[in-house]
Amino acid sequence: MISINFNNFFKTLLLILIAFTLHGCDSILFNPHGIIAIQECSILLISFLIMLFVIIPVIFMTIYFSVKYRASNINAKYKPDWCDSKKIEIIVWTIPISIILFLAFVTWNYSHILDPKKSIISKYKPIKIDVVSLDWRWLFIYPEYHIATINEIMFPINRSIIFHITSNSVMNSFFIPSLGSQIYAMPGMMTTLNLMSNSPGKYKGISSNYSGKGFSNMKFTAISVLNIKDFENWIKKAQQSPKKLNKMSIFNIISLPNENHFIEYFSDVKKNLFYEIINQTYSKNKVFKH
């Protein structure tokens, strides 16, 4: 006969719950700083709360049945011929179907609301940033300011940011967890991502798709500033850089594989460099048009 020590069982369960509740890790996804990230966090919380309608009753019934029908309980009713219950059938089918339908509606609705190509409404003019995934760092081009940077971007809060993204090497993934969605960077193609920060700070940007030996350190910093003057000063700093990026030959040199690359600024960036990079990795018989 198997005996269960329920005191130890509940103590263990309590310790597990405490471990999950009081862990010291900072969950970036649940500490959003952008309007897209806030909505994505809402989806996770809604899905979690809905799934509790399944999880909590199952946990409760598991504990209840194990106690009620334990071998030592002589008062439990023994029904060897029981095989059907309309009430149970209704419950076990109605609740899961309702949950699936609700989650399907939420998914469909938010898939359209959070379309990465969908523009974010703002009273300020959006900032365009062209993003190129290199081995193993990120090149950012500000076409309107004729500057480029490696592993650092800056933008004001409450300003829509339009990212045009490609890769000069293998497929990669562009992701700023605090601000919102990740999107793939693919050679010979362009993807679009719209984000907006609603609070100042420095946010970690990463590659979330394995791309070789330098992948783990393929990080960048996204700086969101409250004062537009800080952004303008940062732009001027880059425009005064002695390093230029006005030729494809220069780009081909800086795009060579390199790990743990430092932050770098370039002035005098070649016009339409981003699209030339795409065409360089595209079919020779086709030209990418923008």
Swiss-Prot record:
Location in the cell:
Cell membrane
* Gene Ontology molecular function terms on file: copper ion binding; cytochrome bo3 ubiquinol oxidase activity; cytochrome-c oxidase activity; oxidoreductase activity, acting on diphenols and related substances as donors, oxygen as acceptor
Cytoplasmic compartment residues: 64-87
The signal peptide stretch is 1-24
Coiled coil ranges (UniProt) are none
Keyword entries, A-Z? Cell membrane, Electron transport, Lipoprotein, Membrane, Oxidoreductase, Palmitate, Respiratory chain, Signal, Transmembrane, Transmembrane helix, Transport
Cite the ranges annotated as topological domain Extracellular: 25-42, 109-290
Query: Source organism's superkingdom?
Result: Bacteria
Gene Ontology biological process terms, A to Z: ATP synthesis coupled electron transport
GO CC, alphabetical: plasma membrane
Q: Any keyword Cell membrane?
A: yes
Main location, first listed in the record: membrane
**Protein name per Swiss-Prot or TrEMBL:** Cytochrome bo(3) ubiquinol oxidase subunit 2
Q: Which organism is it from?
A: Buchnera aphidicola subsp. Schizaphis graminum (strain Sg)
Q: Which gene encodes it?
A: cyoA
